[in-house]
UniProtKB/Swiss-Prot annotation:
EC top class, as a word: transferase
A cellular component annotation (GO) from this entry: cytoplasm
Keyword field contains Oxidoreductase: no
Molecular function GO terms recorded: ATP binding; metal ion binding; NAD binding; NAD+ kinase activity
Record: active site: D78 (proton acceptor)
Full protein name: NAD kinase 2
SUPFAM superfamilies recorded: NAD kinase/diacylglycerol kinase-like
Gene (UniProt): nadK2
Keyword field: ATP-binding, Cytoplasm, Kinase, NAD, NADP, Nucleotide-binding, Transferase
Length: 305
């Protein structure tokens, strides 16, 4: 009996309703269906009294989800896709993402096209697009305090009502650099259209084997986004602030103290997205972000009073 998974956003009633209907339909068609919510992929939130809420990377995989599963259907928006990616990437399960959210930059199709999408996926009429992920670790000495998979970005920033931060950052074997800013972002190509883009980073197409380091509100005109090979690991040391906040994929994270360091490297895992038509990144940029659209015609003269 073939296996399929369903991961849905349990905050959205429509996603939960469709998930139950889809489970019944696929079970009747002879599939072994495992269903879970994306809450299992949400990283624990810490607090000053308990600064680290640690779940091992392979500890997020839901019951019934394994490498024998043909694919997993994700019902939600981009946040649901990010959470689901952490749940299934260690098992290599492909994701068919159905948008029930807002922008749906990472999703493949919309809810009104669900029946056709399921039929096409069951028939195997699709391509797989792999997206690189990061492994993020918080180390104190050689002990791992916290770790997570990251599809978009890791953000390290100051708390409200605190002063500017200094970060000592070492990329690969290169000499460390000091960056003064409100925070720093380390982003994958997938994350280059998210927080990194808003902070002034470039758009990087998904197939480029690169990472980028983007300062947030830097205190220097010379501190600009840096793109470098994803074979280079990154170590970040806080210098002058008693406590920093780290957030992964806008989802959760932990506090970072002066005795800690944040270590990032390209993960051995990747997210496998089911594409029902050949992936066209520039089309998505146009449709979702308005990139490259023609300028609106403007009048050549203005009549003043």
């Amino acid at each position: 009996m073939p296996k399929v998974g369903i991961i849905y956003n349990d905050i959205k009633p429509v996603a939960g309703r469709v998930a139950i209907e889809l489970k019944d339909k696929l079970t009747t068609a002879g599939w072994d269906v495992s269903i879970t919510s994306s809450i299992g992929g949400i990283l624990g939130y810490s607090n000053p009294e308990s600064p680290v809420c640690h779940t091992p990377i392979d500890g997020l995989t839901p019951p019934g989800f394994d490498s024998e599963m043909k694919f997993a259907i994700v019902l939600g928006g981009d946040g649901t896709v990010l959470a689901a990616s952490r749940q299934v990437a260690p098992c290599g399960i492909p994701i068919l993402a159905i948008n029930t959210g807002h922008m749906g930059f990472l999703t493949e199709t919309y809810l009104n096209q669900l029946p056709q999408a399921i039929d096409q996926a069951i028939a195997g009429e699709y391509e797989i697009e792999e997206r690189a992920m990061l492994t993020v670790k918080v180390l104190r000495g050689e002990s791992v305090l916290w770790e997570a998979l990251c599809l978009n970005e890791m953000v390290l920033h100051r708390e409200p009502l605190t002063s500017m931060c200094h970060f000592e950052i070492a990329v690969g074997r290169h000499a460390p650099v000091d960056i003064a800013a409100d925070g720093v972002i380390v982003s994958t190509p997938t994350g280059s259209t998210a927080y990194s883009l808003s902070a002034g980073g470039p758009v990087v197409t998904p197939g480029v084997p690169a990472l980028q380091l983007v300062p947030i509100c830097p205190h220097s005109l010379a501190s600009r986004a840096l793109v470098f090979p994803d074979t280079e690991p990154v170590n970040i040391y806080p210098v002058n602030i008693p406590r920093l906040v780290m957030v992964v994929d806008g989802n959760g994270g932990c506090y970072i103290f002066p005795e800690d360091r944040v270590y990032l490297e390209r993960s051995p895992y990747s997210v496998k997205f089911i594409r029902l038509q050949p992936p066209e990144f520039f089309r998505i940029l146009r449709e979702k972000l308005g990139w490259g659209l023609p300028h609106i015609a403007k009048p050549t003269s203005v009549e003043l009073p």
